[in-house]
Amino acid sequence: MSRNAESTAYRSALEVISAVEPRVADAIRSELTDQRESLKLIASENYASPATLLAMGNWFSDKYAEGTIGRRFYAGCQNVDTIEALAAEHARELFGATHAYVQPHSGIDANLVAFWAVLADRVESPTLERARARHVNDLTEADWFALRRELGNQRMLGMSLDAGGHLTHGFRPNISGKMFDQRSYGTDPETGLIDYDQVAEAAREFRPLILVAGYSAYPRKVNFRIMREIADSVGATFMVDMAHFAGLVAGKVFTGDFDPVPHAHIVTSTTHKSLRGPRGGLVLCGPELAEQVDRGCPMVLGGPLPHVMAAKAVALAEARRPDFADYAERIVANAQALADGLLRRGAKLVTGGTDNHLALIDVTGYGLTGRQAEQALLDSGIVTNRNAVPQDPNGAWYTSGIRVGTPALTTRGLGTAELEATAELIHTVLSLTSPGANADGTPSKAKYVLDPAVADRVNKQASELLAGFPLYPAIDLG
């Protein structure tokens, strides 16, 4: 493909957009500039390929396609069937799964499909069988009332938020917390690692319908074989949310006991993050849950986004190429180089390092809250996000941690030497930032003091570091 093709495509697109609403075109240009000039260390972000991005910008956006392949509620969906089948095929082959459902719009949608598939299989289907009914519409009002009550009285066991779990795993602010009676397992207070004996004890005491594994801020591998054994011991369905580390599974960095697909009853994921695709979700499962999962529409979804499924097909095809395995290995090598560099400079990391794509810095050692550290780094051209640490004294808003991840910088081509240099920049900013005060003189958890000259100097150093690794080098918007 000609390098000029990508520039031509985006220049032409922006010209068309500018003719209608130039401010949108300006924002698109500004976003590219911002992404090119910032050290992006947000663990959940990446850079999708131009092919993936372009696959979303077409007339598939105009189609309704409620239903599944060959069974739509609308006519004229043959081309949607084609791209959905391609995306599902690539997902099955990439992850070694029996069944793939690629319609979810996001990770939470994928989780909701999985939750309701399990509820339908474990709760709804037995009720229908007892009532000798084929469909919920055939139930009497009394049976329907009883089923609704039973569906709302199920239990879920997942990782606690401050240990690195995710809001969508049954926590009260999220809809999943209103669906399930949820309990959490944590990590060892000394090591920060999952204590599988403690998980087993919690499962025995709580007897959940669903045991969830997966994380958004846990910097180590999870032994899914052990987790499946725990689930089996209490009759729970074992679900894994691999949204954060799907790229490491796809790239065969996580194998054996650390690959969730052979061990879980059902697996969910996003298609962005370390998988480097469009924003969206997917569900993987075996034949026993496939029929229920395919009822995601209308059970949870109003219908798929065909243009995003087209982009999923492209991104999943890219992930099946041999060079993706090298990319996945470099993500982890870069994360470990960043973590090691921070440790050598005296930073405190949760669990003392990383086995995956992220590290979690406890910034209380610098005398800061996560919010103060996040903003000071942003002022200096380093984009991160604040995150709670285990037993966090500052809560989920101000936090005591900063989460850093390497998928995006690895996509740009940065290596271990550059991540070592990034550790120095982070340490410099955090060491030279101090807490600020409120107007009444009381200590602030949000305000901070950083010499603008330091921020400018680090910004310049970050720009110099990125100069050799241009983002979307084939795209010149003029």
From Swiss-Prot:
Keyword set includes rRNA-binding: no
Gene Ontology terms describing biological process: glycine biosynthetic process from serine; tetrahydrofolate interconversion
Record-listed E.C. numbers: 2.1.2.1
Signal peptide limits: none
Annotated function: Catalyzes the reversible interconversion of serine and glycine with tetrahydrofolate (THF) serving as the one-carbon carrier. This reaction serves as the major source of one-carbon groups required for the biosynthesis of purines, thymidylate, methionine, and other important biomolecules. Also exhibits THF-independent aldolase activity toward beta-hydroxyamino acids, producing glycine and aldehydes, via a retro-aldol mechanism.
Subunit description: Homodimer.
Protein name as catalogued: Serine hydroxymethyltransferase
Provenance organism: Salinispora arenicola (strain CNS-205)
Gene that encodes it: glyA
